[in-house]
């Protein structure tokens, strides 16, 4: 397996993790958004653009990562991406659970998005869906395949816990089969649902 070493994240780079909404179609056991806040915030495009402009003045070569919630639920994500690209940020990534709402793959191009970064928390359907919800494994795999087929670079985020650490050794072959170019292993932050969970 060959995993590309990206220039997007380096020791000296600035990374802007931009939460554009808190709405999500899933209810993951380790979600970092407090349950009472989920779905309550949805930034209008005007506000997103204003923040992107502010970020570009302070860190013009930063990497922008659009987050949620599920960012593809935002109806103006494509316009936010295009504006971020216009401002000249170093790279643009969209974190997603793979459902890819609003036909986002047809509304932006691989020239505009450096990576779609998919969240998958198990090498098997049983493990992932036990954490992220029924059907989420198939949706994520399908989303990855669609993105790669359209020429987008795909990365994968694996949030490790006692529920899925045993499947980490199974991931390399899956990454290779899916054409994943970056793989991130992250630990659970003790906030949101995770703070009250035993995962």
For each predicted feature, which ranges?
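Radical SAM/AdoMet-radical enzyme domain recognition
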Residues: 45-66, 74-190
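Canonical Radical SAM [4Fe-4S] cluster-binding loop centered on the CxxxCxxC motif
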Residues: 9-46, 59
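Short glycine-enriched, charge-decorated loop/helix-capping segments at active-site entrances
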Residues: 34-42, 129-135, 198-199
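A C-terminal junction/extension of Radical SAM enzymes
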Residues: 8, 165, 191-199
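Radical SAM enzyme core and accessory elements
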Residues: 1-11
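Conserved alpha-helical segments that form or flank metal/cofactor-binding pockets of metalloenzymes
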Residues: 69
